[in-house]
Swiss-Prot record:
The keyword Phosphoprotein does not apply. The keyword Glycoprotein applies. This is Golgi-associated kinase 1B. Belongs to the GASK family. It comes from Xenopus laevis. Residues 62-374 are extracellular. InterPro entries: FAM198 (IPR029207).
Length: 374
């Protein structure tokens, strides 16, 4: 018997069975019976119909097992394709695997099982960016050291003099720094090029000619001597600006000198530029200069030495010795305000009252809170 005839016979038998059940239900319902018996009969009939429907579905699945499995696999693939919609990228590769039935045995039917496992391999991103055309790379400037006759001999003689003044504990760290640090001139092919460069036609309006000359002196001059705890260097050239004559017997500086301070005092360089921009003109010229024999080559602030200022110690320059109480008294008395001479018993100094306001402005801008605590 062919499968088609078997299917038609099963469908006709199920329809005749349904008709028989319906007729018996109508006959039983038409008879007169108590309400309780009718309710029990109704529940039993519904249960019988439900059992018949379930049995027919099981019979259909057993006669065509491949069709039911195919539908289930198609449903799984449809759900997977919906989830992966929109995630496929250009160049992605998809790999499929065929799944076996739950029993573990492979079906002998000629129908091929549909894949239900999907593997996605995304393309890796490029680690290096593509070369962009049209970019312009800045050219590196080459600096040529100018050698002059007699410089080597002068350098060797000054190196021996300076080496004897440096403590023995620092000889090891400064062995390669003196030859570079003595000659501060830099240039190319016999021409001197200053480290202070102005690329416009004129200097900034807040700098005077004396300021620019002092800055070039501090950045380009050769280091000649190192004295006491202050690191000073003297100029062997013609003085660029007129400086007050140092007091006799001071022994600190003869001529034009500079003070090399710690790298932590770099705020003094910023204070000099801020002083000139604001038009106060109360700070000494200072620059930042790299010296290999100081703090492992870190840039240090170099300040112009003014011999007219009285050094309170060997580390800083200040005009008077001042404490917090004296400072408060001078502010209260308003010494030299509007050109009025103060009384002798007030203890005023030569500093005008307006100068304290400028110092307070500097302390606020530079965030200096320990000026009077030193």
């Amino acid at each position: 018997m062919s499968p088609d005839r078997t299917g038609r016979g099963s469908s006709s038998s199920s329809s005749s069975l349904k008709r028989l059940v319906c007729k018996s239900f109508v006959r039983a319902w038409g008879r007169r019976r108590p309400n309780l018996r009718r309710a029990v009969l109704l529940i039993c009939t519904a249960s019988a119909i439900y059992g018949i429907v379930i049995a027919s579905q099981v019979l259909r699945g057993s006669t065509h097992p491949g069709k039911a499995l195919r539908k289930a696999q198609q449903k799984v693939l449809t759900d997977a394709s919906v989830r992966l919609a929109g995630t496929a990228l250009e160049g992605n590769t998809f790999y499929m695997e065929n799944a076996q039935p739950q029993g573990g045995s492979t079906s002998s039917s000629p129908v091929t099982l549909q894949p239900n496992v999907v593997y996605i391999t995304l393309k890796t991103k490029r680690s290096k960016p593509a070369n962009i055309r049209g970019t312009v790379r800045p050219k590196k400037r080459r600096k040529y050291g100018a050698r002059r006759p007699g410089v080597v001999q002068d350098t060797e003689s000054k190196k021996d003099t300076l080496w004897s003044k440096v403590p023995n504990s620092q000889h090891k760290s400064q062995a390669q720094s003196w030859i570079r640090g003595i000659d501060g001139h830099r240039g190319g092919r016999g021409t001197h090029q200053s480290n202070i460069r102005i690329y416009s036609d004129s200097a900034p309006p807040w700098f005077t000619k004396e300021d620019i000359s002092a800055m070039r002196f501090l950045s380009d001059s050769r280091i000649g001597h190192i004295k006491q705890n202050l690191l000073l260097f003297e100029s062997d050239q013609t003085p660029l600006m007129k400086m007050p004559v140092p007091p006799v017997g001071s022994g600190d500086c003869q001529g034009q000198c500079g003070v090399i301070k710690r790298p932590l005092d770099m705020s003094e360089v910023f204070a000099f530029h801020l002083d000139r921009v604001l038009g106060l003109n109360r700070t000494l010229p200072s620059v930042s200069r790299s010296l290999e024999f100081v703090q492992d080559g870190q840039p240090c602030p170099v300040i112009l030495w003014d011999p007219s200022l009285l050094p309170t110690d060997n580390k800083t320059q200040s005009s008077i010795k001042l404490k917090w109480g004296t400072y408060q008294e001078m502010l209260r008395h308003k010494c030299w305000l509007n050109g009025k001479a103060p009384k002798a018993d007030l203890g005023c100094t030569e500093i005008h009252h307006q100068e304290w306001c400028k110092m307070a402005l500097f302390d606020f801008l530079l965030q200096v809170y320990t000026r009077l605590d030193r």
